[in-house]
Amino acid sequence: NSEIFKVCNYIRQKIEDQPNYYSVKPYCITLSGETDEKHRDYKIIEGKEPPPKGYGRRIIISTNVAESSITFTDLVYVIDTGLRYEKYYDPKKYAYVGGKVYIARANIEQRCGRTGRTNPGVCIKMYTKAQYENQFQQYPSPEIETADITDSVLRILNLPFVGGNMINAYKLLNQFITPPSKPYLDR
């Protein structure tokens, strides 16, 4: 979330540095999972309220919450970096780590689908066709492949038909549609 605030502040500063350049200044807003629906900026994002006086076009800097949880009215452009910040469990470190990762092609469709709902729109992709073809998976990885499953394994061990036996727990976990990867089970 801090990155979207930095980007929006950077845009605001650039707009303020050139006060005579814009006849109507763009209004920069951040959108994340923490954005309160009752906040005025949320109503501006949805197009239910206009930006403050002296501002025109909305610039919405968002986390991946914008992929599906909100409908934007009159959105003309989406600029997609093809990245998201993801936390995943590293079984070697026994801790969650995070970093920027490529999104899946399905996420790209969701992001680009935010525009063109009420009028024509454009999706600008900040990656090459080669990157798209070689580095983007078709669908996001199931969470069971990246999350700490310790609590789930402990619950499974308490199931009557598993009886606290780790071998039975392994057998059950390996029957999942997507079983957890071996490093997650071996710890």
Where are these regions (language model features)?
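P-loop NTPase motor module signature
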Residues: N1-R187
